[in-house]
Amino acid sequence: MNARTTFAADTKKTFSRPLLGIMISLSLSTSLYAAQAETMVVSADGGSGAEAESAWGPAPTVAAKRSATGTKTDTPIEKNPQSVSVVTREEMEMRNVTSVKGAFNYTPGVLTGNRGSSDVIDALSIRGFSETNTNQYMDGLKLQGDNYSEFAIDPYFLERAELLRGPVSVLYGKSNPGGVVSLVSKRPTQETLREVQFQMGNDNLFSTGFDFGGALDDDGVYSYRLTGQARSQDAQQAMNKEKRYTIAPAFSWRPDDRTRVDLLTYFQNEPETGYYGWLPRQGTVVPITRADGSQYKLPTNFDEGEQSNKISRTTKM
């Protein structure tokens, strides 16, 4: 009897106390929720805000959110079926990029330094595949060329540079299995744009450029963009110099909100493209040993070519 009475008393105590705590807790939380529900107010004031990002236009931040390279449509990057990297105009300016291959210096899966400091050709090795046969597209059109006849687009005239990794023959036809490069040029803008730049630096660097744009009428039906640049610099190697003169006029016609026609042009003259070569490890990284046992290294401005070994290039699009 005593054992049974003790058991019953203990059971009541251990059961009733937690139940009371649960009831009080539920009551308090319900009251707090009701109070919060009564006082929580969310309001939004409509405004102009930032212009919606387009896969063919400038990105509002360093990191782009949309791309057309993986689908050929204006698609969010996270919904692209393949790996896509986008280097925006803002990022190129932050890093002072002077070549397309330089834009991808920090892009995973890409080797850009296998030609040293030479920017004569935008040699890219994507996922280990050939650096000289990487397909490049500009505004959706393929840049035909190979080896010394390849295009070298100045990044100052680009809005974004995109890299699509992996086989893409379904979208782009015959292409390098490593991937393709897609370039988007600067487009006419309805907003007034006035930019002039000057740059001077080592190796007799001198560069000047301008970027103008805006609407040609009050309704914004017609707009333009005029971008130009002149650049000259001595190469590290003797007997070499880089000279480049580029201009890109563009015109846009927007008869309504759903129709836009762009006329994009690009003219570039390079009387001298600079140094295109490389030196062996022996004599640069490690010294060369003479017959008498002494050692030496090649000078930093050594050029293994001849005075006549120069490349000039003219680009018209």
Annotate each PLM feature:
Residues T98, F104-V120, S149, D154, ...:
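Short, glycine-/polar-rich solvent-exposed loops and beta-turns at beta-strand/coil boundaries
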